[in-house]
Amino acid sequence: SNMWHAGVKGVTYMACNTDRKSLNINPVSNKVRLGTEGLGAGNRPERGRDAAIASLEDIRRYLMESGCRMVFITAGMGGGTGTVAAPVIAKLAKEMEMLTVGIVTSPLVSEGKRRWKQAMEAIAQLEQNVDALLVIDNDNVVRAYDDLPLHEAFSRADDVLSTATRGIAEIVTRESDLVGVDFADVAEVMRNCGRAHMSVTSACGENRVDKVLKASLCSPLLGHQEITGAKNILLNFSVPDSDELKTREVKQV
């Protein structure tokens, strides 16, 4: 729902959940209730997995009718539904030859060993069924905003998930008068790339390019990950029409 409220253009949303109440209050118009009971998975992974498998034909039908070429699968890892439904849905999308990107959050260490173990097992399964996987460490995000009240820090973690999805989606959907990046470019970089990392930052004023490049390497999205061994890098700069990139800034990039 956070991503829907963010209003990313050119993206269609589908909400999947075992919990009828959660789906009813979700603002997304396209919804699939996983399974038939509608009572939630109760933090029981096997129940969430069975529910997702039971609803695969509904999801397949929607993906075919939507005509999409790229699928983002977002979920919070460690619970009962998203943890096990995400790999199941990802496998379906990959089998349908869609560029499949997983963007998930890992639980806080303080949430307990059982939840952490469930999350790590699910992330490993998801990685086998997507082209690219971004894992956002909630501990890193909360640590970056440790001066905020706890509920606001968790809200920022949700914002990071939305920002990561928006960042990739807008590379494909946003038009550019300079060097255009289209779906084929994104597919070439992300197809079967495995674990990926992403950073989204902003800057303004003097030396804005230098500022944004340095800030990108310190983003909560990256945590402590090194990108020196990356095989491919996809860069996208968005600037207002009134203050477009200068020639020297393009050379600097």
List each language-model region with its residue ranges:
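Tubulin/FtsZ superfamily GTPase core signature
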Residues: 1-253
